[in-house]
């Protein structure tokens, strides 16, 4: 709709950088698209992949992040990338696990081990990492209600 952001300040959750130029921001997928694809999204049809790529039902699925930090993350998993902001690391792991659980994405054993080790090393509260069945139901309902939002003319 040709709208542009005229100004503002944004706090990057990954690095705690305070940004004043919208062009420094990028939208990051908590679970990178490539990671999602190899973790199970390759089985999905176009509409589900499109919905995953644009999902707004869970506020931590898409993150407004400092572009340089997002580029450093790339398509890495927690075994090779963690955000530098120490106070955000446990939340980052929780959000990543939530997205994986919601979308039925798998983990390689090395990724699962790295996450388990990080939870211990960072002294994350294991109970805070739990995801309730009610949360999953709520998000699953949102997914089902919005599965037709992407281009309906595209044929698998």
Regions found by a protein language model. Give the residues of each.
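Long, compositionally biased stretches
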Residues: 1-11
């Amino acid at each position: 709709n040709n709208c542009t952001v005229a100004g503002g300040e944004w706090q990057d959750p990954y690095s705690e950088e305070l940004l004043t130029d919208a062009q420094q921001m990028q939208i990051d997928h908590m679970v990178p698209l490539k990671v999602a694809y190899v973790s199970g999204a390759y089985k999905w049809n176009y509409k589900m992949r499109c919905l995953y790529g644009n999902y707004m039902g869970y506020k931590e699925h898409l993150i407004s992040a400092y572009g340089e930090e997002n580029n450093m993350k790339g398509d890495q998993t927690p075994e090779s990338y963690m955000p530098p902001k120490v106070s955000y690391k446990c939340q980052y792991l929780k959000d990543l696990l939530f997205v994986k659980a919601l979308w039925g994405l798998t983990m390689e054993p090395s990724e699962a081990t790295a996450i388990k080790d990080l939870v211990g090393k960072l002294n994350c509260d294991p109970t805070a990492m739990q995801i309730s069945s009610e949360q999953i139901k709520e998000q699953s309902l949102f997914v089902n209600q919005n599965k037709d939002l992407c281009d309906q003319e595209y044929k698998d």
